[in-house]
């Protein structure tokens, strides 16, 4: 038996990790919008790889310590 219950919204069941993914995606877009004007992407070798790593780090932090 899982310690995290399945959440049901409008008759659709979602695993708890789905909501953590949605929150981390929202937080990623906010952080990405804050980083773009700073010019940090000029120093990044591969922006898509940087964005993927940033999302993975945010997801890990939220899943491990947050939600």
From Swiss-Prot:
Q: Keyword Transmembrane helix, does the record have it?
A: yes
Q: Which UniProt keywords apply?
A: Cell membrane, Membrane, Transmembrane, Transmembrane helix
Superkingdom of the source species: Bacteria
Q: Which residues cross the membrane?
A: 10-30, 43-63
Q: How does it sit in the membrane?
A: Multi-pass membrane protein
Q: Name one GO cellular component term.
A: plasma membrane
Q: Where in the cell is it found?
A: Cell membrane
**InterPro entries hit by this protein:** DUF1656
Q: Which family does it belong to?
A: Belongs to the AaeX family.
Name of the protein described by the UniProt record: Protein AaeX
What species is given as this protein's source?
Answer: Pectobacterium atrosepticum (strain SCRI 1043 / ATCC BAA-672)
């Amino acid at each position: 038996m899982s310690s995290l219950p399945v959440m049901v919204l409008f008759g659709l069941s979602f695993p708890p990790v789905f909501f953590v993914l949605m929150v981390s995606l929202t937080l990623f877009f906010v952080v990405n919008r804050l980083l773009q004007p700073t010019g940090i992407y000029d120093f990044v070798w591969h922006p898509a790889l940087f964005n993927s790593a940033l999302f993975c780090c945010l997801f890990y932090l939220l899943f491990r310590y947050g939600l």
